């Protein structure tokens, strides 16, 4: 800057020291000082310049979009001229707040003073009017230097000429008339004592014009500016948006109604006063002309509220024509305000819980649909219960909401909502976080009722399921059901082999599941080929241990792996983890159940099922062969199977090892869980697998001194969560045991000794019967 300024100086001044800076251009000086004249001291100029510019805060970032845009707007203010005020600056915010409070005071005080006060030259009244007129005049001047927000084009006018032109064309005339300092004129020339009645009435008319100023300020502030105030206060006090907006709207409605009643009450007394209280007006008829202003205001307010609420005429019906017209005007304004208040209040109440309102509207349509098709009562009840458990009284368009969000925010929400599912599944714990996120973003939430078939035997597998909450049973022909509960998954082998379901899966309780379609499953595994290899490796290992083979999986495993050496390590880790969990079922001592945690097991196969159910899911495949522990049946409750010892879940990354603590738990319903029931002396059920697929069942008698009750077909439970003994185990043609009365033994079976228990005596237990077919070792 100095190099450019030196040629303009004379030759005699060329030796001026460099520290003496030549005077800068006016525009450059204003830009350096933030739009403040150079005559002000440097610290004050910078401080004032900062107050006149928009600051970087949440509101400015929402308006302009970025820090860079805010800086550009600040540069616009600096280059616009001296004392140009940005409409979003801190100075304008505090000034508008002061004007808002002063405006509310004028809205309340001025009507009362103009209507009821006769002595208008008292010091308090003069001070109030002088301060009000001063602030209104200052606001009139500042409006010429404040940028104007053009709502049509979302543009902010900062050029002085553009601001002046637009303000002169809009609200300048109204502001000028309403800002005439009448009290200044009375104080300076002292004309008020010498004014006649007509001039005095003219002065009152000028005071009434002050309402135009107040209304113009309301329109200048704009509703958006009021919302901006409340948003900034909300951020300061850390209030939630819904609560803050609801409270503000309620206060706005109540305040507007009270303010209109206040104005109407003052108007009811002002009109008779301007007519010098004629004999047919309500003030003269009630002899209230010389009463105190408080009494007059109270009666006027009561009369106005009676009209506005349409509940009567007050103390008496109107007689004179002015009172009649005032009454009609009050009724019209009151009816309009009442309708607006009811409408806003209704909309406010509905907006407070819009999701529940949408649910109620949707369920009304469902009820009409059920009535139109004349559905039976039990079906209607199931539909009602489904909606209650699926939506829980609130309905959201979740796909639309998540689709409008950014991808990182959508992934964060999905990870948070599915955190319980991820925490219960070691498959996700051992997998890449990107794989977990890719799977979770493609899951679909589903709800099933007790008795619903989630998977039907013989159908083509198009989905796999992850269990968030609930209890399900795997059913196959001629086989006992196997339990699935929180944290388990099933159906992945059919997606890998594109085969058919070999068993059905039934919901025993209300189940909240997440499904993954075959297309999404393959898309995720194509993106993460190492996880496909891991799925296939674990599936083949499980099928191999139960003597099953799958040509499709073998062919895929023979193909070269596209992954690195770390993928093979992960596969070995998953397979080893799977085998360790399977061996943990056999290695658990019978007496350790009481010392372990009471958390229910994730897999609880009650009996060994035939080999045909092995491929239903990779988790079931292990559960079918590694359950060696006996399952006692309580003599006091034939319908309940009791856990004699803690059993580990089947080895699977999807079913983690969770110990069980034996404890008393009564079966309170058809779906009562049996994973934490005690083990009283009773018969125990054991089944072994044969290559022919037949379940060979035998019963072990209770220890000496134990009692027993008859196990008949009528005592079997109806619930799938409490399966019973087969009828051939308690047939009428089976031999009875000595001394047991009504107890019966199966016609044939294999007697097995539970691990860690004492073998009953030969007098109480018959010799084991050799099965017809060869047995598969459980240690496979």
From Swiss-Prot:
Side Extracellular, residues: 118-123, 192-200, 274-296, 319-328
Residues in compartment: Cytoplasmic: 1-96, 145-170, 222-252, 350-780
Membrane-protein topology: Multi-pass membrane protein
UniProt catalytic activity: K(+)(in) = K(+)(out); Na(+)(in) = Na(+)(out)
Any one GO molecular function term: cAMP binding
Sites where the protein binds 3',5'-cyclic AMP: 491-492, 494, 501-502, 542, 545
Complex and partners: Homotetramer. The potassium channel is composed of a homo- or heterotetrameric complex of pore-forming subunits. Interacts with HCN1. Interacts with KCTD3; this interaction increases cell surface expression and current density of this channel. Interacts with PEX5L.
Intramembrane segments: 297-318
Region span, Disordered: 1-47, 549-569, 687-780
Keywords for this protein: cAMP, cAMP-binding, Cell membrane, Glycoprotein, Ion channel, Ion transport, Ligand-gated ion channel, Membrane, Nucleotide-binding, Phosphoprotein, Potassium, Potassium channel, Potassium transport, Sodium, Sodium channel, Sodium transport, Transmembrane, Transmembrane helix, Transport, Voltage-gated channel
Gene3D superfamilies reported in the protein's UniProt record: 1.10.287.70, Helix hairpin bin, Jelly Rolls
Start and end residues of each stretch annotated as Interaction with KCTD3: 353-780
Signal peptide, first to last residue: none
Comp. bias regions, Low complexity: 13-32
Region described as Involved in subunit assembly: spans on this chain: 45-90
Xref: PROSITE patterns: CNMP_BINDING_3 (PS50042)
Carbohydrate-modified residues: 290
Name of the protein in question: Potassium/sodium hyperpolarization-activated cyclic nucleotide-gated channel 3
Chief location: membrane
InterPro entries: cNMP-bd_dom, cNMP-bd_dom_sf, Ion_trans_dom, Ion_trans_N, K/Na_HCN_channel, K_chnl_volt-dep_EAG/ELK/ERG, RmlC-like_jellyroll
Record family assignment: Belongs to the potassium channel HCN family.
């Amino acid at each position: 800057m100095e190099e450019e300024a030196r040629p303009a100086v004379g030759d005699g001044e060329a030796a001026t020291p460099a520290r003496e800076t030549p005077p800068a251009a006016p525009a450059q000086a204003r830009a350096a000082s933030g739009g403040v004249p150079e005559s002000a001291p440097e610290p004050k100029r910078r401080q004032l310049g900062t107050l006149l510019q928009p600051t970087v805060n949440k509101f400015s970032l929402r308006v302009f979009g970025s820090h860079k845009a805010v800086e550009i707007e600040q540069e616009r203010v600096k280059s616009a001229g001296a004392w140009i005020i940005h409409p979003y600056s801190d100075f304008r915010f505090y000034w508008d707040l002061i004007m808002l409070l002063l405006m509310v005071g004028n809205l309340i005080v001025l009507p009362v003073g103009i209507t009821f006060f006769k002595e208008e030259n008292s010091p308090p009244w003069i001070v109030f009017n002088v301060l009000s007129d001063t602030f209104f005049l200052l606001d009139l001047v500042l409006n010429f230097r404040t940028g104007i927000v053009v709502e049509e084009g979302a543009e902010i006018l900062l050029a002085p000429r553009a601001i002046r032109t637009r303000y002169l064309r809009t609200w300048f005339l109204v502001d000028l008339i309403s800002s005439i300092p009448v009290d200044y004129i009375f104080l300076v020339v002292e004309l008020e004592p010498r004014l006649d009645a007509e001039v005095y009435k003219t002065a009152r008319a000028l005071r009434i014009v002050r309402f135009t100023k107040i209304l113009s300020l309301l329109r200048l502030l704009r509703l958006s500016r009021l919302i901006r105030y409340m948003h900034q206060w909300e951020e300061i006090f850390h209030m939630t948006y819904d609560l803050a907006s609801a409270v503000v709207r309620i206060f706005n409605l109540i305040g507007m109604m009270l303010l209109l009643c206040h104005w109407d009450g003052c108007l009811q007394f002002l009109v008779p006063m301007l007519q010098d209280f004629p004999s047919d007006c309500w003030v003269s008829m009630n002899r209230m002309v010389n009463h105190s202003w408080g009494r007059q205001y109270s009666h006027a307010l009561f009369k106005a509220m009676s009209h506005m609420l349409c509940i009567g005429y007050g103390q008496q019906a109107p007689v004179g024509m002015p009172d009649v017209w005032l009454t009609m005007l009050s009724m019209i304004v009151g009816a309009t305000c009442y309708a607006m208040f009811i409408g806003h209040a209704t909309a406010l109440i509905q907006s407070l819980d819009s999701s529940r309102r949408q649910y109620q509207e949707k369920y009304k349509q469902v009820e009409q649909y059920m009535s139109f098709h004349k559905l039976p009562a039990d079906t209607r009840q199931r539909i009602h219960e489904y909606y209650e458990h699926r939506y829980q009284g609130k309905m959201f368009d979740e796909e639309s909401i998540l689709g409008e969000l950014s991808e990182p925010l959508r992934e964060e929400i999905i990870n948070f909502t599915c955190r319980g599912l991820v925490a219960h599944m070691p498959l996700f714990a051992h997998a890449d976080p990107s794989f977990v996120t890719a799977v979770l973003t493609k899951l679909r939430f589903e709800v099933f009722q007790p008795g619903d078939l989630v998977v039907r035997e013989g159908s083509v597998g198009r989905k796999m399921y992850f269990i968030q909450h609930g209890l399900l049973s795997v059913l196959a022909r001629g086989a006992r059901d196997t339990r699935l509960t929180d944290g388990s998954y099933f159906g992945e082998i059919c997606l890998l082999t594109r085969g058919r379901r070999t068993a059905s899966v039934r919901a025993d309780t209300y189940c909240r599941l997440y499904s993954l379609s075959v297309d999404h499953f393959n898309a995720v595994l194509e993106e993460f080929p190492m996880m496909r290899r891991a799925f296939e490796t674990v599936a083949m290992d499980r099928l191999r241990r139960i003597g099953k083979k799958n040509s499709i999986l073998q062919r895929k495993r023979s193909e070269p792996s596209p992954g690195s050496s770390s993928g093979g390590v992960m596969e070995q880790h998953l397979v080893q983890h799977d085998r360790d969990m399977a061996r943990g079922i056999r290695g658990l001592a019978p007496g350790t159940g009481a010392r372990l945690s009471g958390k229910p097991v994730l897999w609880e196969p009650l009996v060994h099922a035939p080999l045909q159910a092995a491929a239903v899911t990779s988790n079931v495949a292990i559960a079918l062969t590694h359950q060696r522990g006996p399952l006692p049946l309580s003599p006091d409750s034939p319908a309940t199977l009791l856990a004699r010892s803690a059993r580990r879940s089947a080895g699977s990354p999807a079913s983690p090892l969770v110990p069980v603590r034996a404890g008393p738990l009564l079966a309170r319903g058809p779906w009562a869980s049996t994973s934490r029931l005690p083990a009283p002396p009773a018969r125990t059920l054991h089944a072994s697998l044969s290559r022919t697929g037949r379940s060979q069942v035998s019963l072990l008698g209770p220890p000496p001194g134990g009692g027993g009750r008859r196990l008949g077909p009528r005592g079997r439970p109806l619930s799938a969560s409490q399966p019973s003994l087969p009828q051939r185990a308690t047939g009428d043609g089976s031999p009875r045991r000595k001394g047991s009365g009504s107890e019966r033994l199966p016609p044939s079976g294999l007697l097995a000794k539970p691990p860690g228990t004492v073998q009953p005596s030969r007098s109480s237990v018959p010799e084991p019967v050799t099965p017809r077919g060869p047995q598969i070792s459980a240690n496979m």
